[in-house]
């Protein structure tokens, strides 16, 4: 509960006040009382009640608003019944409104593991009555589409009849797409004899040392993802955002002076791409563009069994190739997992400092079909 009361310094309630009121310059606001109550009804829903009163100088009249309602779920189906009353000082009539709404998700009729394109869609219906003979009915469907749920759609039709309002039908539809290179929207509405079409595009651009990257509309603080070679890789927890053809992406919003976790979805990597790490943490300052850099290994993936003489290469040996100086560790039986390999080349193997603890592998990867994720072969280390 909250409120306030203002008294003039003289104590004279009939004193003419300053002309500051928004609807009548003579009646400026004097005091306000508010009350709001809500109650959870266990598994049966919630109920609420709210009321307010606004008083003014130079009049005994006041604004009054009262509303109460009940929200009841039936599993994943939600319903609500609300009543509202308002009486404003500048109106001679009192307004009443009784409203009912129903929302049913399409998933109510689907299996929990359904992959239907409409699993994130809903059907809705609402009815309102002004208790003076006027009634409005609205029904529609809305939801999200595409694997990343980055296409929002809404379709709604309605009709109004009776009371003091003009009768007629209305309709509305819209599409909103959030993409890696920007956002687009288009919509159409019709009410009575008038109709309207609207459309729009928005986005952001960052120019940096490596070129230009397009993205969604930019905030004050943001992150530039740099993963050269890892193209079209989804950014986790970012709707519609993935790396471009060069491996760059923009995260348009970031929390300043806090750790921001930037993660690439490893499941969206190409078959010949492997990341040294899939998560990078950045801490941007206010208004900064922080860079999250990922190192991508591009090339073949091989599970190779290494032989040295008549034995397997020792457990724990380090295998390096090309510019990959971090190396891979040999497991039992001389097996080592290698990524980013060119079609042919050399591998350096080391398990000690003397010359008998080092050897070279000459390898050539076989031609495989695009769907093959992992090559397996045995190689001799000399």
Curated annotation (Swiss-Prot):
Record-given protein name: Fimbrial usher domain-containing protein YdeT
Any one GO molecular function term: fimbrial usher porin activity
Domain of life: Bacteria
GO biological process, alphabetically ordered: pilus assembly
Disrupted gene: phenotype observed: Increased biofilm formation.
Pfam families attached to this UniProt entry: PapC_C, Usher
Gene Ontology CC terms, in alphabetical order: cell outer membrane
InterPro entries: Fimb_usher (IPR000015), FimD_plug_dom (IPR042186), PapC-like_C (IPR025949), PapC-like_C_sf (IPR043142)
